[in-house]
């Protein structure tokens, strides 16, 4: 019997990352209201948000592994999710340019069969290029940063403005593949168990 692998996220980037691993997940968006959670510790916040998203979906299914994720970028001790407007995105990029930040991705993996749950956090240091105002405005006008935690997509146009990473590359895209492999192993699975 094949165990369903369910991604509790509407993120196309997370789905694509799983597909590169050989996992074609069932996608179930949780529609969880993130504003319900108010925590100041970034790691606790991304893990709690990931857990809540996974739990919403887990309560809707009878079996399978459910993966929830949430990402935030911290720059100068301030945490950022998706910008709410183009103006906010421009202001963030003016703070980010020539600076570095830490991208945190919370991972929650729920195993309905074993009634187990794991929480982990991937952490990656991101170094941004010293981009011009014209580059910032053009990038924001593309619409891409408005769809991304941290206001940039490493796998898209935003990759042009990232000079260096320290840590897991896929974590910055929204899902640490090495961390997921470790979590699967801890639950007694291998990645190959979910290959299509």
Swiss-Prot record:
Enzyme class: hydrolase
Coarse class of the protein's main subcellular location: cytoplasm
CDD domains associated with the record: Maf
One Pfam assignment: Maf
Entry's Gene Ontology cellular component terms: cytoplasm
GO terms of molecular function: nucleoside triphosphate diphosphatase activity
Keyword Cytoplasm belongs to the record: yes
Cofactor field: a divalent metal cation
Active site per UniProt: 70
Stretches assigned to coiled coil: none
Enzyme Commission code(s) on record: 3.6.1.9
Keyword annotations of the record: Cytoplasm, Hydrolase, Nucleotide metabolism
Reactions catalysed, as given in the entry: a ribonucleoside 5'-triphosphate + H2O = a ribonucleoside 5'-phosphate + diphosphate + H(+); a 2'-deoxyribonucleoside 5'-triphosphate + H2O = a 2'-deoxyribonucleoside 5'-phosphate + diphosphate + H(+)
GO biological process, one term: nucleotide metabolic process
Localization: Cytoplasm
HAMAP family registered for this protein in UniProt: Maf
UniProt-listed PANTHER family: BIFUNCTIONAL DTTP/UTP PYROPHOSPHATASE/METHYLTRANSFERASE PROTEIN-RELATED (PTHR43213), BIFUNCTIONAL DTTP_UTP PYROPHOSPHATASE_METHYLTRANSFERASE PROTEIN-RELATED (PTHR43213:SF5)
Function: Nucleoside triphosphate pyrophosphatase. May have a dual role in cell division arrest and in preventing the incorporation of modified nucleotides into cellular nucleic acids.
Family, similarity comment: Belongs to the Maf family.
NCBIfam families, sorted: maf (TIGR00172)
Protein name, UniProt field: Nucleoside triphosphate pyrophosphatase
Species this protein is from: Gloeothece citriformis (strain PCC 7424) (Cyanothece sp. (strain PCC 7424))
Upper lineage: Bacteria, Bacillati, Cyanobacteriota, Cyanophyceae, Oscillatoriophycideae
């Amino acid at each position: 019997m094949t165990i369903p692998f369910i991604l509790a996220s509407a993120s196309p980037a997370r789905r694509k990352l799983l597909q590169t691993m050989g996992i074609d997940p069932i996608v179930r968006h949780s529609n969880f209201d993130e504003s319900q959670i108010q925590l100041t510790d970034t790691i606790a916040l991304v893990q709690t948000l990931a857990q809540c998203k996974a739990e919403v979906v887990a309560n809707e299914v009878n079996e399978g592994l459910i993966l929830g994720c949430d990402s935030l970028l911290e720059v100068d001790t301030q945490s950022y999710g998706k910008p709410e407007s183009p103006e906010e995105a421009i202001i963030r990029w003016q703070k980010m340019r020539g600076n570095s930040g830490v991208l945190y991705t919370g991972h929650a993996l729920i195993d309905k069969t074993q009634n187990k749950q794991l929480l982990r956090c991937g952490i990656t240091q991101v170094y941004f290029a010293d981009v011009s105002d014209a580059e910032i405005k053009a990038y924001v006008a593309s619409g891409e940063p408005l769809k991304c935690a941290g206001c940039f997509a490493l796998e898209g146009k935003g990759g042009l403005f990232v000079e260096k990473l320290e840590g897991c590359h896929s974590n910055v895209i929204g899902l640490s593949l090495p961390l997921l492999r470790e979590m699967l192993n801890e639950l007694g699975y291998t990645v190959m168990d979910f290959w299509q």
